[in-house]
């Protein structure tokens, strides 16, 4: 038939059996990739430090999605939350990966069967003996089944009735764990950070889907609507399916980038807005002030700050810091975090406490500026020493550390002070191992950034695909000159062109 590469799907346009086959093969490829990718990530994953070297720092992509649904342990005995010596049974990371690979093989065999046995009685109208698909009925079946799945996921898996529940945590991502979640049916269920709303909405949406599916199975569409929306054309199915997919892709791109209820920061890393707002910095300061009010010293107060919370308050963990085309995990950029060095407090020779202005998300380089409590610049690291008025040497800045590895130490050597000021510009300071991965010092984004970028791009492409195929099916008679009411059957897989006398008709 000599089809160009971009028209090859024409061969399944009038062939329901092989249309099923190629969809089965596609699902086999997806399941096979997911299982294989999970095994690859498990092979390179370092589970030794769940606090400073979590999965999102290591560039894991499929493991976080497994963990948020309740799979958190490995047959090697470790858990995402840091425990060791565990026996998770079959439903471990490896077990789920193996299940996907086995499923992929079964789907492959099903695809082969349907490719060979394509001409089934199922696709023939018994009244006329002609090939026919009842697309509105198929729509009802799919709607009913997807509603059933949605309801089952919410009512059983998430609630813990028959399943593990879901990943829940505190607002600062410190206590994350998997637990059953009760549905929240009140106004609080609409709080985007309330996991109970996720459960309630899956149950509600599932019920709506089941009812809608039964409706479409029992009620036929009006003839005018059937013809107006080309409900008898398989390309209508393609167009509306693409619409569902691109809409879902836009939604999940938004929830991934802006939210963390279903994309916990312990599994996917912080959002960029938490750095923009100083979200973790405010919580750290609140905890320190609370300790000071109870009579603790600065050293004691800062020593109560969890290392995990301090690590979130570091700009290198913001997904907006890595360029979209810098490949590799975050650890390939700044290195593997080893320890928190403590909180630095800078003072000039006048005794004023100075604060280093933090680097915004979208800057690669930023001037190191130290301001007093009133926001007045008192010291900096100048670009041109010849014109400097506020250099560390001129202003006599010193730095003292509270909490962390350098607790209680004070540095007055200008080169040391400048080194720690540059670290403070990036948030809380950490020592990094840059040798293990030959880290180049250039920030990378987290899986949160990859997922958002990928889904936003594909959503845009699929949006145009929806417009394209929707236009083709609505205006098929205009584009092809084929009457939409034409009932003459052509050979399966052969494209009927206008005035094409060579197209073989069925006997």
From Swiss-Prot:
The residues on the Cytoplasmic side of the membrane are: 2-16, 117-134, 219-233, 475-507
Kindly give the membrane topology term recorded for this protein: Multi-pass membrane protein
NCBIfam families assigned to the protein according to its UniProt record, in alphabetical order: PS_II_CP47 (TIGR03039)
Q: What InterPro entries does its record include?
A: PS_antenna-like, PS_II_antenna-like_sf, PSII_PsbB
Record's cofactor remark: Binds multiple chlorophylls. PSII binds additional chlorophylls, carotenoids and specific lipids.
Which segments sit on the Lumenal, thylakoid face? 40-94, 160-196, 256-450
Keyword set, alphabetical order: Chlorophyll, Chromophore, Membrane, Photosynthesis, Photosystem II, Thylakoid, Transmembrane, Transmembrane helix
Q: Name one Pfam family in it.
A: PSII
Q: How does it assemble?
A: PSII is composed of 1 copy each of membrane proteins PsbA, PsbB, PsbC, PsbD, PsbE, PsbF, PsbH, PsbI, PsbJ, PsbK, PsbL, PsbM, PsbT, PsbX, Psb30/Ycf12, peripheral proteins PsbO, CyanoQ (PsbQ), PsbU, PsbV and a large number of cofactors. It forms dimeric complexes. Contacts PsbQ.
Annotated membrane-spanning segments are: 17-39, 95-116, 135-159, 197-218, 234-255, 451-474
Task performed by this protein: One of the components of the core complex of photosystem II (PSII). It binds chlorophyll and helps catalyze the primary light-induced photochemical processes of PSII. PSII is a light-driven water:plastoquinone oxidoreductase, using light energy to abstract electrons from H(2)O, generating O(2) and a proton gradient subsequently used for ATP formation.
The reply to whether Transmembrane helix figures as a keyword in the UniProt entry is yes
Say which family it is in. Answer: Belongs to the PsbB/PsbC family. PsbB subfamily.
Q: What is a single molecular function from GO for this protein?
A: electron transporter, transferring electrons within the cyclic electron transport pathway of photosynthesis activity
Q: Which GO terms describe its cellular component?
A: plasma membrane-derived thylakoid membrane; plasma membrane-derived thylakoid photosystem II
Signal sequence, start to end: none
Q: What SUPFAM superfamilies does the record tag this protein with? A: Photosystem II antenna protein-like
- Where does this protein chiefly localize? membrane
Q: Which domain of life is it from?
A: Bacteria
Q: Which HAMAP family match?
A: PSII_PsbB_CP47
Q: Which gene encodes it?
A: psbB
Record's subcellular location: Cellular thylakoid membrane
Full protein name = Photosystem II CP47 reaction center protein
Q: Name one GO biological process term.
A: photosynthetic electron transport in photosystem II
């Amino acid at each position: 038939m000599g089809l160009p590469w971009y028209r090859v799907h024409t061969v399944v346009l009038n062939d329901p059996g092989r249309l099923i086959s190629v969809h089965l093969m596609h699902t086999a490829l997806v399941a096979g990739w997911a299982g294989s990718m999970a095994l690859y990530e498990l092979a390179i994953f370092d589970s030794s430090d769940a606090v400073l070297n979590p999965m999102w720092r290591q560039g894991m992509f499929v493991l976080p999605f497994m963990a948020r649904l309740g799979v958190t342990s490995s047959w090697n005995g470790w858990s995402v939350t840091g425990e060791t010596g565990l026996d998770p049974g079959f439903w471990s990371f490896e077990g789920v990966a193996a299940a996907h690979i086995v499923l992929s093989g079964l789907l492959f065999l099903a695809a082969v069967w349907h490719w060979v046995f394509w001409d089934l009685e199922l696709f023939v109208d018994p009244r006329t003996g002609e090939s026919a698909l009842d697309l509105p009925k198929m729509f009802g079946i799919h709607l009913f089944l997807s509603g059933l799945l949605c309801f089952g996921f919410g009512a059983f898996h998430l609630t813990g009735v028959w399943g593990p529940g879901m990943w829940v945590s505190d607002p600062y991502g410190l206590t994350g764990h998997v637990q059953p979640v009760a549905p929240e049916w009140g106004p609080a269920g609409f709080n985007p950070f309330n996991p109970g709303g996720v459960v309630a909405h899956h149950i509600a949406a599932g019920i709506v889907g089941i009812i809608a599916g039964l409706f479409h199975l029992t009620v036929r569409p009006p003839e005018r609507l059937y013809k107006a929306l080309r409900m008898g054309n398989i390309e209508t199915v393609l167009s509306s399916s693409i619409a569902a997919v691109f809409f879902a892709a836009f939604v999940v791109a938004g929830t991934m980038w802006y939210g963390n209820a279903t994309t916990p920061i312990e599994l996917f890393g912080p959002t960029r807005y938490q750095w923009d707002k100083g979200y973790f910095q405010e919580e750290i300061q609140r905890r320190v002030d609370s300790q000071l009010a109870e009579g603790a010293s600065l050293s004691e107060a800062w020593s109560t700050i969890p290392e995990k919370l301090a690590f979130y308050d570091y700009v290198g963990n913001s997904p907006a810091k890595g360029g979209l085309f810098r490949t590799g995990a975050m650890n390939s950029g700044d290195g593997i975090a080893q320890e928190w060095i403590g909180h630095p407090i800078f003072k000039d020779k006048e005794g004023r406490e100075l604060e280093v202005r933090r680097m915004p998300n979208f800057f690669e380089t930023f001037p190191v500026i130290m301001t007093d409590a009133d926001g007045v610049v008192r010291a900096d690291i100048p670009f041109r020493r010849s014109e400097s008025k506020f250099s560390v040497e001129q202003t006599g800045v010193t730095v003292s550390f509270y909490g962390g590895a350098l607790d209680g130490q004070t540095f007055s050597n200008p080169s040391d002070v400048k080194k720690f000021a540059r670290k403070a510009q990036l948030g809380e300071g950490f020592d990094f191992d840059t040798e293990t991965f030959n880290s180049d010092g250039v920030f990378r984004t987290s899986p949160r950034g990859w997922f958002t970028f990928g889904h936003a791009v594909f959503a845009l492409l699929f949006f145009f695909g929806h417009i394209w195929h929707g236009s083709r099916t609505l205006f098929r008679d205009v584009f092809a000159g084929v009457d939409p009411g034409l009932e003459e059957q052509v050979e399966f897989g052969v494209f009927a062109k206008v005035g094409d006398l060579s197209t073989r008709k069925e006997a």
